[in-house]
Every structure is written in C-alpha cells, then in structure tokens.
Curated annotation (Swiss-Prot):
This is Uncharacterized RNA methyltransferase mlr7480. S-adenosyl-L-methionine binds at residues 243, 270, 290, 338. It comes from Mesorhizobium japonicum (strain LMG 29417 / CECT 9101 / MAFF 303099). Its EC number is 2.1.1.-. InterPro entries: MeTrfase_TrmA_AS, NA-bd_OB-fold, SAM-dependent_MTases_sf, U5_MeTrfase_fam. The lineage of its organism: Bacteria, Pseudomonadati, Pseudomonadota, Alphaproteobacteria, Hyphomicrobiales. It is an enzyme of class 2 (transferase). It holds the Pfam family tRNA_U5-meth_tr. One of its GO terms (biological process) is rRNA base methylation. Keywords: 4Fe-4S, Iron, Iron-sulfur, Metal-binding, Methyltransferase, S-adenosyl-L-methionine, Transferase. [4Fe-4S] cluster binds at residues 62, 68, 71, 143. The active site is at residue 364. PROSITE patterns: SAM_MT_RNA_M5U, TRMA_1.
C-alpha cells in the first residue's frame, strides 16, 4: 500500500531517507526536500511517483535508470552530486586532522570493466544488471557509464551468454576493454560440453574478442588481453582486478608517484597486476607483494619485458594472514597499499610501527580507510592530504588516496 512521504536527506547508499514514527524509511531514487508516494515494506519503500521534485533533480542519462540497479544517482544535479560524494569522505574521516581535496571527477562512458548478470528466461537470454536490491535481471541496451566498446558489444555478448549457458540459474559475465579487444570472463554458467566449447570458440573468433574464459579456465585466447600501466604493457589474467576507469587509475598513480618520488626503494602492498608498481619502477626500486599468483605473474612478466625500469621484485603473500612486519618494512623508504574494501587493519598496525617515511593509502571504502588512518596516526604518522576520486560514477561508492609521512623525530 502506498503513502506520501517527505525525503529529509540522502543515506550512505544514495537512497532518500524519510522520517516516520517507526523509524527511518529508505526510498531509492529520491532527493532531499522531495514529496513522494512510495510503497512501504518494513524500512524500505519503492518509489511510485514524485509529487514535488527537488530543484536538484535532473533527467537521468539512461533509459534503464530506476529499473537497473547499477546506478543510484543519475537524477542528482552534477555539482550537488560531487559535493555529496566528497562529503562521504569528509564524514568518514571526521576526527582525523587532514586536508581533504576536491573530488576528482570521472566522465561518463569511461568505465572499462563491468560485471554483468545473465540468465536464460522464457523470453530469451537476459544480460544486464540486477534490479535495485533484487535478484531480478534487467536486460540493458545502453549503459552511459561504460566505454562505447562494451555498449556496442552488448548484443554480441548476449548471444555469447546464450551459447555458453549450461545452467538454469543466473551467472556472471565480467567484460574488460583491453588494448587487444574485449576480455570476457564468465563465472557459474555451468559445465560446457565439447560441442558448446567449439561453437563458443568459433563465435569469439568471428566477433574479434580477445579471450573467453569460464571459471578462470581459458576457453579460447586469440590475443592476449593487454593493459598499459604507464609505459609498461601487461598481459592480464582472466578476471584480473583493474581500477574501474583508466582516468581514475592515472589520477591515483600521479598522486601516489608525486608523494613517493624521493623514495629509492618502495613497497607496493596488495599490488595486483602492477598498476602502481610498474609506474613507480620508472624512478624507484619496487617490491610488489600480492596474494593472487596469476596477478603477480602478470606483473613479473610485464616488468621483465619492459625497458627503462629500476629493479622490480615480487612476493606472493596473503597480507591478511601474514602482513609484512615492521622490521621487513624498515628496508623501504616509501610504501603504497591498496587493499580490498575490508581495508588492511593488521598490515596498518605493522606500518604504524615502522620507520617508512612516506606512505600512500588507497581505498575504495572511506570507513575502513578512516580506521586504518587512525592506526597510522597513533603510530606517529601525519596525514598530509586525502583526495576523493569518483571512479564509480552515479553509484554510492567513492575512491580515496591518503598521503602520509612520519617525521624523523617519531621514527625508531
């Protein structure tokens, strides 16, 4: 049953929040000050109509907005949206003495990697994103966050999903734009028979895709998918982690590189395929530490075949179970760490005890970043600046890069 509500503020996930007698009510796709009708179910409600619109409401960029759950904030005026994103970092770091820069904006049509949901239905193959907080898949024909190469291939990717589908359940298709073409990594689509493998392989060849892998097994690889990290070409493994946009990666690399420019020997923790390590190696020796063997192998190959780099070494290590100790860290004079959303609490405790003079912390979660920064501050580090980066356009997520140093008097 629908009722009328007045939205008071935006929540952390970008939902509008209305205050009711029974507590806060979360209404997606609404803005502060709006009067709306919505169908309530416990503490959430589905938007039915906007009765009085905010002056900050704009036309969304995509026809699928409000059905597709991929974006939360296309209806929010650009400047107000950017301020809200920056404020997420400000609020998370409340109580930490630091300068927070303006948000680094990222343009539409720049996301190079998307994870699509797929499922065979009675009407055909669905390929797109899940509806907001729902397992239902909204099949898409456009996507204004994604690179044009992905959007132009949606029909062909849908056809490929149909060819490889061997399950009645939904499955995932990660699509990455590389210098060699589209890298398609599929997960949980079911076991392929030999006939299906041949048909899928022929389709990939005909469509010019660089690679098809299923559950990390390479089905066919006409060309190795290559990504540039600065001047270094890296052949990335199936399902490799990459920053969402190349522009955001470049912005982060420049911020980190400037901070660590005086370091002669740098540690890159949670190094992935080398997006920081291989750029930093242009000026510094780098020791890259990463838990994923395939990613570390890709980094190593990229370094070995590159020219003009300082020495690059690699170490496979689970930094959650076995963080580098402060004694190990003391052999470096610069450090960057870029952990998953959970942050790097145990590793931060070791960094805090170390004498590394220059540290850069990269995070996609301001809450865990705040926790890790507090650990470093308590260990004698000073936060020089924090830069929010909007690489997850129109979502509630925001990246941030924090730069720290430890004054000489606080070392040892």
């Amino acid at each position: 049953m629908s009722a009328r509500f007045t939205v008071k503020k935006l929540g952390a996930q970008g939902d509008g929040i209305a205050e009711t007698e029974s507590g806060d009510l979360f209404i997606p796709f609404t803005l502060p000050g709006e009067s709306v009708t919505a169908a309530r179910e416990r503490d959430r409600a589905a938007l039915m109509a906007v009765l009085e619109a905010s002056l900050l409401r704009i036309e969304p960029a995509c026809r699928h907005f409000t059905e597709c759950g991929g974006c939360a904030l296309q209806h929010f005026e650009a400047e107000a949206y950017r301020q809200w994103k920056r404020d997420k970092v400000v609020h998370a770091l409340k109580g930490i003495d630091c300068s927070i820069d303006e948000l680094v904006a990222c343009a539409p049509h720049t996301r190079r990697r998307v994870v699509l949901a797929a499922r065979r239905s009675e009407t055909g193959m669905l390929l797109g994103f899940n509806r907001h907080l729902s397992p239902e898949i909204i099949s898409i024909s456009e996507c204004p966050i994604s690179l044009p190469e992905i959007v132009a291939a949606l029909d062909r990717l849908r056809a490929l999903a149909d060819l490889i589908c061997a399950t009645t359940k939904s499955f995932r298709m990660a699509v990455t734009v590389t210098g060699s073409g589209l890298d398609v990594a599929v997960y949980e689509s079911g076991k392929l028979g030999e006939h299906q493998r041949r048909i899928a392989s022929n389709f990939v060849l005909a469509q010019g895709f660089a690679r098809l892998s299923i559950d990390d097994e390479i089905i066919i690889e006409p060309r190795k998918p290559v990504v540039m990290f600065g001047s270094v070409a890296v052949a990335v493994p199936p399902g490799a982690f990459l920053q969402a946009t190349e522009a955001a990666e470049q912005a982060m690399a420049e911020i980190v590189g400037t901070h660590l420019k005086r370091a002669k020997k740098v540690a890159d923790l949670f190094a992935g395929c080398g997006s920081f390590a291989l750029r930093l190696a242009a000026k510094s020796e780098v020791h890259a530490v990463e838990g994923d063997a395939a990613a570390l192998s890709a980094l190593d190959r990229g370094a070995r075949f590159a020219t003009g780099l300082k020495r690059v070494t690699g170490e496979r290590r689970d930094l959650f179970r076995r963080p580098l100790t402060f004694k190990e860290l003391n052999t470096f004079d610069g450090l960057v760490f870029d952990p998953p959303r959970a942050g790097a609490e145990d590793q931060s405790k070791q960094i805090a005890r170390s004498d590394v003079p220059f540290v850069a912390a990269v995070s996609c979660n301001p809450v865990t970043l705040a926790r890790d920064l507090r650990i470093l501050i308590d260990g004698g580090y000073q936060v020089k600046s924090v830069t929010p980066i909007d690489q997850f356009l129109w979502s509630s997520h925001v990246e941030a890069v924090a730069l720290l140093d430890k004054p000489r008097r606080r070392r040892g």
